[in-house]
Swiss-Prot record:
Keywords, comma-separated and alphabetical: Activator, Developmental protein, Differentiation, DNA-binding, Metal-binding, Neurogenesis, Nucleus, Phosphoprotein, Repeat, Repressor, Transcription, Transcription regulation, Zinc, Zinc-finger
Transmembrane portions of the chain: none
Disordered: annotated segments: 1-21, 33-70, 95-125, 354-407, 598-635, 1144-1171
Domain notes: Uses different DNA- and protein-binding zinc fingers to regulate the distinct BMP-Smad and Olf signaling pathways. C2H2-type zinc fingers 14-19 mediate the interaction with SMAD1 and SMAD4, while zinc fingers 28-30 mediate the interaction with EBF1. zinc fingers 2-8 bind the 5'-CCGCCC-3' DNA sequence in concert with EBF1, while zinc fingers 9-13 bind BMP target gene promoters in concert with SMADs.
Name the record gives this protein: Zinc finger protein 423
Physiological role: Transcription factor that can both act as an activator or a repressor depending on the context. Plays a central role in BMP signaling and olfactory neurogenesis. Associates with SMADs in response to BMP2 leading to activate transcription of BMP target genes. Acts as a transcriptional repressor via its interaction with EBF1, a transcription factor involved in terminal olfactory receptor neurons differentiation; this interaction preventing EBF1 to bind DNA and activate olfactory-specific genes.
Amino acid sequence: MSRRKQAKPRSVKVEEGEASDFSLAWDSSVAAAGGLEGEPECDRKTSRALEDRNSVTSQEERNEDDEDVEDESIYTCDHCQQDFESLADLTDHRAHRCPGDGDDDPQLSWVASSPSSKDVASPTQMIGDGCDLGLGEEEGGTGLPYPCQFCDKSFIRLSYLKRHEQIHSDKLPFKCTFCSRLFKHKRSRDRHIKLHTGDKKYHCHECEAAFSRSDHLKIHLKTHSSSKPFKCSVCKRGFSSTSSLQSHMQAHKKNKEHLAKSEKEAKKDDFMCDYCEDTFSQTEELEKHVLTLHPQLSEKADLQCIHCPEVFVDESTLLAHIHQAHANQKHKCPMCPEQFSSVEGVYCHLDSHRQPDSSNHSVSPDPVLGSVASMSSATPDSSASVERGSTPDSTLKPLRGQKKMRDDGQSWPKVVYSCPYCSKRDFTSLAVLEIHLKTIHADKPQQSHTCQICLDSMPTLYNLNEHVRKLHKSHAYPVMQFGNISAFHCNYCPEMFADINSLQEHIRVSHCGPNANPPDGNNAFFCNQCSMGFLTESSLTEHIQQAHCSVGSTKLESPVVQPTQSFMEVYSCPYCTNSPIFGSILKLTKHIKENHKNIPLAHSKKSKAEQSPVSSDVEVSSPKRQRLSGSANSISNGEYPCNQCDLKFSNFESFQTHLKLHLELLLRKQACPQCKEDFDSQESLLQHLTVHYMTTSTHYVCESCDKQFSSVDDLQKHLLDMHTFVLYHCTLCQEVFDSKVSIQVHLAVKHSNEKKMYRCTACNWDFRKEADLQVHVKHSHLGNPAKAHKCIFCGETFSTEVELQCHITTHSKKYNCRFCSKAFHAVILLEKHLREKHCVFDAAAENGTANGVPPTSTKKAEPADLQGMLLKNPEAPNSHEASEDDVDASEPMYGCDICGAAYTMEVLLQNHRLRDHNIRPGEDDGSRKKAEFIKGSHKCNVCSRTFFSENGLREHLQTHRGPAKHYMCPICGERFPSLLTLTEHKVTHSKSLDTGTCRICKMPLQSEEEFIEHCQMHPDLRNSLTGFRCVVCMQTVTSTLELKIHGTFHMQKLAGSSAASSPNGQGLQKLYKCALCLKEFRSKQDLVRLDVNGLPYGLCAGCMARSANGQVGGLAPPEPADRPCAGLRCPECNVKFESAEDLESHMQVDHRDLTPETSGPRKGAQTSPVPRKKTYQCIKCQMTFENEREIQIHVANHMIEEGINHECKLCNQMFDSPAKLLCHLIEHSFEGMGGTFKCPVCFTVFVQANKLQQHIFAVHGQEDKIYDCSQCPQKFFFQTELQNHTMSQHAQ
């Protein structure tokens, strides 16, 4: 998962990474203005609101209920109402170009990101208005920063708003199951539930932190990033983005404004201390207060205590501090073990350790000063510089009254400290530098400060100073400032040389092995990029190629050292073959510890006493060379200089004792840099130090490939992907295969048996065995090889019995089309034929054609009159027309005089005449005769239209074929060539009987105009096309034309029904006669339909009952009406009754299912018998039963005789019920049809075979079955049923 943008808080827009910066900027601006105590009550509450607002943005669920906002928020200036796309543009505009910017709060945090943010007052506006936020904060009000999105209330804090929104339960439908909190969106509820369940799937790869949301992980990852390229020009603080820096700059601007205001108020009011809350009436008192209580923050404080980091302004204050705070402490000399009771004695004693001035020494600072100056930071920039000829140091200022100048008139040097991050270099003490680093450069990473004596790292400069003063006070040596010196001293022996080339040759020969060759060149070569020195040019070239990846860098030639020039301090490694030269002893020592561990010092021809002391395990001391002027015969003069420090000794014993001190220093116990614990060996130190850096984490290892995973889910996924194999199991032989191809080959070889099917070429029947085919040929084709099967109706012969049966079905088609010579055996087929071929959308007009006599006239009222005459004639012969399903009066047909096409509505005929013959409504007979005169000779056999040419007829025939019909009826699925014909067809689906009444409000409709107006009164909101529907049949209309056609159709039916009830036909009602007793009934549902010799007959319930009991053998004449009522018996139970009323009451009480037809007097022709009985049919043998118990007994007999298994003879598949077998045979019938199943009677399409089976059982009866068995009276809907029946029942 494109990813959804997280929503920002509604009222405040704080960009990522700067929420904490903004809060710090606000706090600093408030603190600069004098803190909260000097503010009004409204200011304090507003600041608390902003603090709450900034703190809420860092919570896990600060954006839960907020909706998605736009990708870019708009920043609006409150003075000129100009919009900006970013906070930086708005800040620049407010600072330089806004004409209305005043001294008020810029209100940069008041972003118009919510719809109501422009209408809500900012915190400064509330302050200016003097709002009272303390009254009813939780109840809310108007004009506050956090408005409710559901009502008009607003609140000063976001927490109050969240609590208030929970009362709108109707607007928050999603509820947390753990804490019952409500949410507006489901995604917010799901995000909140993760806080309860602890589902944190986003893990940080730097630490063990985990988060439930990816944006929280991104914010957390910024804490691991140390790059902050954007720095503040005021305080040098770094930021990760420009927006964070600009937001931070607002704090300086506010601070400046608050300071300006405080200065204005200071002229009128008291003076307040910037470091505490004390106020003073005069400036002198404030300065005295700062010097007394805050001396470390004063610019005049430059005297530092030698015991603690406090600084003081004058000497008297410093001495008073030492006597009060450090009176009981003994003051030790850092150079020797002597102790003194006063500081003055220590300073006087330190003069004895200073070396006298000579031509080969520069002026050395005080040893204590040297111990401070010898401390260096790990970074190259944090260094201490010694200024010659400057004022005395702060540590020497207490001795100004005793000895300020040396005997030779030279002043002591002053040590000053520089900041490694800015250009400020005038810090007089370490304490002042530390304060500067902690206040101005607090965002910088913490650096370690390394001691040059023991290489220990300290967190601060003050700790380094205390470390040198306490641990190395007996071995501290001053930093010497060398002047004009021309002698070069060897690091490993007391010899001195006049030039650097001689020194390098001496190191090669004497200290790099007995067989070492002297270098070819006489000069040293230095890299111009890193200033590293090399003895040969090839070594320098190789270094440039490897370290700086370049070949064109130029080298720095070795300077020619003259006796009058200054020296260059260099340190060479005695182990490297290219003899690199380092600029400091610290770099050389680190190089030896990293690259030459456990390597003893190189061979030397000198004695051990003349060599430098070396650490036994790791360290090799390579001290700074002592370059002294003069000859190399200083030892012969009786002076033994120490190459580790600047001391000289007059005899060899004292020199040897001094060297032992350096050796003990190098062989000291090694301390842990984390906890300062001492260890005897490096191994124990390393083992201990590993504990500080070791963290344990649980990993899950794969046993197969040894891969590690942080969670069990990752391991399981790896196992499923890499080490899981899918096996294929053969259920026939239980064999297992590792691939799909293998099991396919196995099934094809082992379990694929050939099975031959034998098909009869004459009738296309398939047989499993050759014997079955032989039996079939014997019975069907052996007797008469020629066409042995002859139709008894027409004499046509056929070669197979199946072909004869299919032909015989054409003779039983009792439904003839009145427009053409085609006949059909089902009503639904005739209706379909009329719709497709003759555009007739009602099939009720074929009543008069059942006997094969088509109508000879197309007049409007003739079919209805003929039907009325047949119904009114009491002496009419017994016929079956009145008992058919289509016995209703047919709709009036409108035929075209030119082409013979017939339509059910006059408007459809007019549309046809206009569309096909160009004859408009209302034209005279001359135009019609002219059109008839020009009628073509080519006639369409489908719709009887005529054309002048064969090409025109061919193009017309394309309209009757499938591909041209692009419009499908949504009700029945039938397709039509045009939208107009589809509209005309959809009207015929109307089943509404009350055609003149609105089905919504039951209001009668009289005309088409009233129908259209009434449809507009009941619009259909679900119809997105027109918004209307037919109020009579409730069909949805897609156009205004379709609505008008509906109106014409329903109003014509209304006119037809009113014409039938006119005085000419008043009192006439359609009656239905029983074919046996000729009794008349008002509804055709009162008659039971029977098929006798292929013709339908209607019998009443009484005649059906008597026929079932064997009482009636044929058609009996009607009983006389004046028969006495005595001797009436019940036809069901043969009980005698005295009157017809008693018999009728008995029939209704005891025989409710069947109402008998008694021989007593009838009340009239309008009495309606009871409905026909419900029957049950067996699927297996198609026998019919009257009640459910009988069919259950019958089915049980089938199960006892035949078993519960029913076999499909076409595929040999077994089923446990006949219904499932029938469904399976339906699937056989539609194999290869694309998964669709069409009803063979009404052509309704289904997607499942069982649905089609249910449809046939519910809609169609025995009379609708198509395929007849030639050997038994059973009928079937599908040919596969007939085949399966023949193969199972008549195979022998």
